Each structure stands twice: as C-alpha cells, then as structure tokens.
Amino acid sequence: MPDGKFIIKIDKQSSGEYIGKVAWLKMKYYGKGDKEEGVEQHDRNNKNSDLKSRKVLGLQVVGELYEKNGNLKGGYVYDSWNGKMYYGSAKMDNENTLLLRGSFDKKGIFGLTQKAKRVTDPSAYGLKD
C-alpha cells in the first residue's frame, strides 16, 4: 500500500503471535478515474476469487510474526494493492518507528522495507487506543 495512505494496527495475541489489520484508510472508496470509482476498497487483486470481495478496511495484512531476539520474524505481509503475500519481519528502528519488511525469500534478503510511524493521536483518525 502507498505510504501515508493507511494505518495498520498491530496487536499481540494471547498466543504470542503479532497480527496487523488495516485500521484506517485515507481513501475508503476508490477515487475519481478508477474503474470502480465510489466503491469501497476491497481485495480486488487477490488471486483467489473467493477473497476479492473482502473489504480492505479491517483486513489482516500482517500475521504469524513471533518475537525472537527483540525482532518479529517468521510471518507474512500481505499487499492488497497487488494481491501478493510476502515473507514478513519487523523491528523497531526507534521508539516511534517500526521497520516492516516484506521479502520474496524466507531469509529476507530480497524485499522491501517500509517505515511505519507510530500514531500518537489515534482519535485524530477516528480511532480508539
């Protein structure tokens, strides 16, 4: 997903797994000029036709991450913009910045790292703590 266009809320489950769901979208509906203009964004690029109707808002896009040596490893990152799943890992760059990596290989050598900034005022986006 493009930078600054969404918020992913990451939570630790009772099992120890960290998951992330899309909690906010800058554009909840497809914009002007899009073939689905005015329609709520959904998982339209998913290869599985049964999943294409899932709404992006609330969609789990990070999962199966477990803490190991202060980092989160072993999971996945799903990109609803292209419908692809990547091996996932994450680590804190500093107190307010998470480095979330999606890679083609399990070791994380070939991929892309995206900086995620902590939301300090969730209410500004209509979110609760």
Where are these regions (language model features)?
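Short His-Asn-centered micro-motif
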Residues: 1-2, 101
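Central antiparallel beta-sheet cores of small beta-barrel/beta-sandwich binding domains
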Residues: 2-88, 117, 121
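A residue-level signal for beta-strand positions that form part of recognition/binding surfaces
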Residues: 17, 97, 113
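Low-complexity, intrinsically disordered Gly/Pro/Thr-rich segments
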Residues: 95-104
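Edge beta-strand at a domain terminus
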Residues: 104-129
